[in-house]
Amino acid sequence: MNLTAQIARHFREVHFGGNWTSVNLQDSLAGITWQQATTKVDSLNTIAALVYHINYYVSAVLKVLEGGPLDAHDKYSFDLPLIQSDEDWEKLLNKTWTDARNFANLIEQLPESKLESDFSEKKYGSYYRNLHGIIEHSHYHLGQIVLIKKIILTGK
């Protein structure tokens, strides 16, 4: 297996399962209602806000992988559209899963030599650094989602 295939696999696994941590976004979010997803626990972000935030960066990098410019700004990364129904919540989840599948597929298509190239601009570092950054970022916020879910479900 070449390096881009391994990176794509690692990205898929944090979203859909099979990683060595045995924790993934899809399973962790299964059964979460829109009400639970939007429940505020102390000063923590909501589950929905974290899902949006993870996918905000996946979506931005996906556009670069598709040949477009990088257009992401940290100040907008938590600008979650209002979620007030099952339909709103499912729409966010479906976009997250679709973007994740497309993202992984495009990583697999990258030639390995591209991993050393500057990502969008030199200041952002290499493709390798950014792709792994997206995976690390997703794992980090997945951990938060799991903990917030436990707090909500146990009522503590």
Locations of regions flagged by a protein language model:
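Acidic/histidine-rich alpha-helical segments that form the ligand environment
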Residues: 83-117, 129-134
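Short, contiguous alpha-helical
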Residues: 2-4, 8-22, 26-29, 34-79, ...
